[in-house]
């Protein structure tokens, strides 16, 4: 499916994008990475609210342990996720950069699935999604549900819904199955 998506993105980029941003410029990378991160937030929030998408995402949240193995619990299909990034080639981001930016986003999110890192220095906690933010996202306690959907940056959580600090540490897992 990724190859087909790459072909689709290439067609959108080639025939529909009003301009093409240069891949050798730093600002294109910033736009690509932040764009993927914003659209990841949109998709991730949707995945928690739309029953069909939650059915593919719930395995990631079902572990009662918050560790690197939890990070590897990924869906086998894209459940429409690939459609979320269509605006990026339309904005002139080269398709290969969209995929690489998504890979960077996913690799970043791997390390935040751990209990071994506590709260970090306050400026880091403010700018980046950290294990303490993501612990809240995986929490099954009522006060932690539906929080902190960000990938790399928690800014979207600050803008679109209040972030929560884990006090005390939340129990992880899921309280629901196919119901979002």
Regions found by a protein language model. Name each.
Residues 1-2, 22-176:
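Membrane-embedded catalytic scaffold of the fatty acid hydroxylase/desaturase
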Residues 179-180:
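Charged, amphipathic alpha-helical linkers/stalks
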Residues 6-30:
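Juxtamembrane/interfacial segments at transmembrane-helix boundaries in multi-pass membrane proteins
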């Amino acid at each position: 499916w990724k190859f087909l998506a790459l072909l689709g993105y290439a067609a959108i980029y080639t025939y529909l994008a009003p301009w093409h941003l240069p891949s050798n410029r730093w600002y294109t990378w910033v736009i690509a990475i932040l764009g993927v991160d914003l659209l990841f937030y949109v998709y991730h929030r949707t995945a928690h609210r739309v029953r069909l998408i939650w059915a593919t995402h719930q395995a990631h949240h079902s572990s009662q342990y918050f560790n690197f193995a939890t990070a590897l619990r990924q869906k086998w299909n894209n459940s429409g996720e690939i459609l979320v990034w269509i605006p990026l080639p339309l904005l002139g981001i080269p398709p290969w950069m969209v995929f690489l930016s998504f890979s960077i986003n996913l690799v970043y999110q791997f390390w935040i699935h751990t209990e071994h890192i506590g709260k970090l220095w306050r400026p880091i906690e403010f700018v980046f999604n950290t294990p303490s933010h993501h612990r809240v996202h995986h929490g099954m306690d009522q006060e932690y549900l539906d929080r902190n959907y960000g990938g790399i940056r928690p800014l979207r959580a600050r803008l679109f819904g209040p972030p929560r600090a884990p006090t005390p540490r939340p129990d992880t897992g899921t309280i629901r199955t196919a119901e979002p």
